[in-house]
């Protein structure tokens, strides 16, 4: 009985951790554009600055996020970065423009996994 109780507690803990990770949150975001347009991304695709993609240091390629600032946009992780300070997400110019992030350029955005 004791082992079953511990197993149930461990399972509940894992479920709560998994659901909180998948829930989303906020992160410091920036955008990148012209200089990288047409170059190869970390996953081998050609970067399209007008597309709705993003770079993240560790999320798996293909991960889809709904990113919100003044509006919301769905993006797919296809590159690595950003590598400047505390920034965690680098949106394509098109995605940043869709949510109103091109000016100021860097700010906290909210996100959820989709």
Residue ranges and their predicted role:
Residues 2-114:
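Secreted/periplasmic proteins
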């Amino acid at each position: 009985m004791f082992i079953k109780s511990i197993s149930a507690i461990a399972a509940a803990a894992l479920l709560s951790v998994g659901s909180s990770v998948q829930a989303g949150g906020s992160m410091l975001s920036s955008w990148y554009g012209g200089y990288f347009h047409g170059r190869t991304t970390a996953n081998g695709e050609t970067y399209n600055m007008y597309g709705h993609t993003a770079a993240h240091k560790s999320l798996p390629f293909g991960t889809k996020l709904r990113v919100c600032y003044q509006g919301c946009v769905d993006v797919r992780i296809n590159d690595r970065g950003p590598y400047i300070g505390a920034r965690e997400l680098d949106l394509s110019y098109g995605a940043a423009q869709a949510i109103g992030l091109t000016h100021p350029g860097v700010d906290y955005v909210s996100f959820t996994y989709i």
